[in-house]
Amino acid sequence: MIRIEPYSDKEVKSVLTNLMNNQEFMKFIKSNLNKSTSKFLSIPGSSLMVMQLFKSKIKNINSVKEFQDQVKLVLKSVVDQTIEEFQTKGLDNLESNKPYLFIGNHRDITLDSALCNFALDSIGQDTTFNAIGDNLVSVDWMGDLLRLNKSFVISRSGASKKEIYTNLLKASEFIKNKLDGGNHVWIAQKQGRSKDGIDKTDPAVLKMLHIALRKTCDFQEITNYYNIVPCSISYEIDPLAVEKSQQLQNTKSKDLDEDISHIFKGVMLNKGRVKLCFADQIQGAYSPESLAH
């Protein structure tokens, strides 16, 4: 069974220690130090120095917050170096101390939720717990990194309908538990990225959210229990436009590690201007289909 929950503070140190001893992870980090965009990294021996600095920082991390503090520094650098202008709209409408369920469009595997958190942090809001697919934890070290960063897994696979339902129930209960505890949650509006640029919410995602509430309320009352806020992000330049086009045209088969390479390419390459908009909180009674539209 796939673990759904992210890591807790008490697990952080041991997980990071295992990562530092994971040769596959360390090799990937070293091979992805971008010499083409850094004059320092073009100096002989500089990559080794960066790796030692990386390891020393990791040793001082003892909690999820401390890990996210380091992620925040990296993300700030990504925004400064790969985004020409980052605009937000609707942040002023978010109330403090109110747990929101953000349902977002999905263009980039990790940046959509990361930039949502970047925006929330800028106004003093807590970061979200982020929903990810089980495909992203198929490589152990990537699963570790994502779980350290408050990601939880929604598994839609299973040997039987009962197993699939059980997995979705666990995810729904996790989301309910976090929202009830005063935490924000981010989830994509549908499974997989919008490779064709069409953003459309899948009613199945909304039905999954209601599973944990089925004994409490009808679906039409879900907006009385969850503070649902749609959010939408747009990238002027998509670093993975070619790859998405190839997948749409079935001209390129998907490799096992393709998601990982797409994550790093999406993070490291130029994105031009980026805009993130938060809509008003949804009120009223809806069916899954009407809420999706």
Regions found by a protein language model. Give the residues of each.
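Soluble catalytic domains of membrane acyltransferases
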Residues: 74, 78-282
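Long, compositionally biased intrinsically disordered regions
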Residues: 288-293
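Membrane-anchoring hydrophobic helices of lipid-metabolizing enzymes
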Residues: 1-100, 106-117, 121, 143, ...
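Hydrophobic alpha-helix feature that most strongly marks membrane-spanning transmembrane helices
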Residues: 283-287
